[in-house]
Amino acid sequence: MGLEEKLPSGFLLTTVEQAAGWVRKSSVFPATFGLACCAIEMMTTGAGRYDLARFGMEVFRGSPRQADLMIVAGRVSQKMAPVLRQVYDQMPNPKWVISMGVCASSGGMFNNYAIVQGVDHVVPVDIYLPGCPPRPEMLMDAILKLHQKIQSSKLGVNAEEAAREAEEAALKALPTIEMKGLLR
């Protein structure tokens, strides 16, 4: 996104990468993409009792251009999938995605043609959060695991190429569940 992509690979020391990772993980700005009942638990996590501000997430961003984390909470319909992808494409790099709830991760109990059977077919997902709906403590644990992933992410020329390859691999992956039952 900036100067770190212009540096040759191997130029940055690990301590500088660790410092940059600490800065990135301490200032993650989430964008809400609440689509169903999981969004209620996501809003609860942002309230005073759970206090996401101590993790650097003061407020959920209303614009994708100001966010670097998308929390997809709930089922995604086929008509909503292009909108989800457009919002993801508008986010600046580096960007991360948490798939919150079983509906976002695999379609959940909505095993039909109208629901995307896993949001990972639309955008690359970094953390899967199971549950129907997951508790706020589980979302906080997923955020902490994402912080660990951000802390260990590399900088430099190879970072953008690695992100592109990971996105292509995620979008070409086989479905996470098999359509069966009355529909097939």
Curated annotation (Swiss-Prot):
Localization (cell): Cell membrane
Membrane topology field: Peripheral membrane protein
Cofactor(s) needed by this chain: [4Fe-4S] cluster
GO biological process assignments: aerobic respiration; electron transport coupled proton transport
Cited InterPro entries: NADH_UbQ_OxRdtase-like_20kDa (IPR006137), NADH_UQ_OxRdtase_20Kd_su (IPR006138)
Protein's UniProt keywords contain Transport: yes
EC number(s) recorded for this UniProt protein: 7.1.1.-
Subunit structure: NDH-1 is composed of 14 different subunits. Subunits NuoB, C, D, E, F, and G constitute the peripheral sector of the complex.
The protein's name: NADH-quinone oxidoreductase subunit B 1
Gene behind this protein: nuoB1
